[in-house]
Regions:
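Extracellular/periplasmic juxtamembrane segments that couple receptor/chemosensory ectodomains to their
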Residues: 215-218, 230-233, 243-309
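Hydrophobic segments of polytopic membrane proteins
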Residues: 183-186, 192-199, 234-241, 253, ...
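Extracytoplasmic/periplasmic sensory segments of membrane signal-transduction proteins
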Residues: 30, 44-172
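Extracytoplasmic/periplasmic ligand-binding sensor regions of membrane-associated signaling proteins
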Residues: 128-132, 136-226
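Extreme N-terminal signal-anchor transmembrane helix of membrane signaling/transducer proteins, especially
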Residues: 1-23, 307-309
């Protein structure tokens, strides 16, 4: 009788601990998603800030490009891997930080762009150095920014991109909807808004990513798009449980595109006995966040209770 009572008592205590842990961790998973959502909102704000800076530069009265600058641009203009532009294989044009790729073989077509794009460099640099203020929103890292000009058919990457590894040859990718956004949707639906793309395979990295797209307008007409790629490493930094590093070992985190079915597996538990806590949340744009914790986390974090049982 005494042995049975002890078993009942210790089992009741263990069940109580398990239920309490379930409630606490369910609330914590909701907190993780809320923090990630805040990080996405901040990324949207930064993208909009960059796009606004570019639009102001486009709207300002442009002085004519000097003969010296035009000569420097055309001397640095090069062709490689069936594409053309500036800083394709090495940093030959110091006026731009990154790489400009274009479908045109004529350097005169990108002279004005090369004179304008330092405004994009300044905007990205300024936004990257904004303080986090201890919010832990994953803002300290440097995500991949670029500007796509739909009218003049060029793309400018803030980070240098070696054309031997990636060349923008598919200039109709937006119209084909390969990133989940069609040009007609941009023109009709999200004037001035930042849109989250579907999850798609990035041509540059061959990995599943999603992008934030902010339109750039001139005189009310769509001219280009400022893009920010969010990849698996970015998402790991956003979702990482800094205050509970042990939990990360037993946490499953996946983003799934509800339309295409593509996913980004952000983290997987080291062991998978069975899930004892899970949480699913749908973000705007058809992106589903799925989180779950393996039972081994409870056993590891509550080992004294398990040992007592």
């Amino acid at each position: 009788f005494i042995a049975a009572s002890v078993i009942v008592l210790t089992s009741s205590f263990l069940i109580f601990e398990l239920v309490a842990s379930d409630r606490a961790m369910s609330a914590y998973l909701r907190y993780i998603v809320q923090k990630a959502d805040s990080s996405f909102l901040y990324d949207k704000y930064q993208n909009q800030s960059i796009a606004a800076h570019v639009m102001r530069a486009l709207a300002a009265e442009q002085s004519e490009v000097s003969p010296e600058q035009r000569r420097a641009i055309c001397e640095a203009f090069e062709s490689a891997n069936n594409t053309h532009g500036l800083n394709l294989t090495a940093h030959k044009y110091p006026g731009l930080r990154g790489t400009l790729q274009t479908a045109s073989t004529d350097c005169d077509t990108i002279v004005e762009a090369a004179a304008l794009l330092p405004a994009f460099d300044q905007a990205v640099e300024g936004n990257r150095h904004q303080d986090d203020y201890g919010s832990g929103l994953g803002m300290a890292e440097e995500k991949f920014h670029y500007y796509l000009d739909l009218n003049d058919r060029y793309v400018y990457f803030y980070e240098p991109v070696n054309v031997e590894y990636f060349a923008m040859n598919n200039w109709s990718f937006l119209q084909s909807g390969s990133i989940g956004i069609d040009r007609k949707d941009i023109e009709k639906v999200f004037t001035g808004r930042t849109v989250l793309s579907s999850i798609y395979q990035d041509q540059r990295t061959k990995q599943n990513v999603m992008s934030l797209l902010t339109p750039v307008y001139v005189a009310g007409q769509l001219k280009g798009i400022v893009l920010l790629d969010i990849n698996k490493n970015n998402l790991r930094n956003i979702f990482y449980t800094h205050d509970r590093p042990l939990l990360w070992r037993f946490l499953n985190v996946t983003l799934t595109d509800t339309d295409s079915g593509r996913d980004i597996i952000i983290n997987q538990s080291e062991d998978n006995l069975f899930q004892y806590v899970s949480y699913v949340h749908d973000l705007p744009g058809g992106i589903r966040v799925s989180l779950s914790i393996d039972i081994l986390y409870f056993i590891t974090s509550s080992w004294k209770s398990v040992l007592f049982w």
